[in-house]
Amino acid sequence: YVVNYGTAGSLNKNISGLIEVSKFYQRDMDVRGLGFQLGQTPFENDLFVQLDKNGYSCGTGDSFVMTSPDLVTDIVDMEAYSYAKFCKINKLNFICFKFISDNADDDAGKDWSKAFKKGAKEFSLFFQKEYEGIKI
């Protein structure tokens, strides 16, 4: 298994705490001017990576989100899409958990700093309990 844990900003005020993510978009891929959809990498068929489970959607990009992005997902981060895509291509099991650290707004930077350690502790306790014995 490849496990991704990290913090994320929520674009949905009803999402908080530690969540599992199952759908991944590349939120800052924008070549609509060439006829592709927002989030679509040119000459690739898939607009997103979907795991075989239920969970939230995540838009990954190269920026810390402080305003609503054009490609709207449940949460935003800066790394999960690349892990999900790598694992899909290489047929590796992948699970992804995010701790909601902020609401991807003007206060995101301050909120993230406060939530970072709390999220790591919650994930550690959760993972030890739920995935005892899993080989990573």
Residue map of PLM features:
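Glycine-rich phosphate- or other oxyanion-binding loops that anchor nucleotides, phosphorylated ligands
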Residues: 1-136
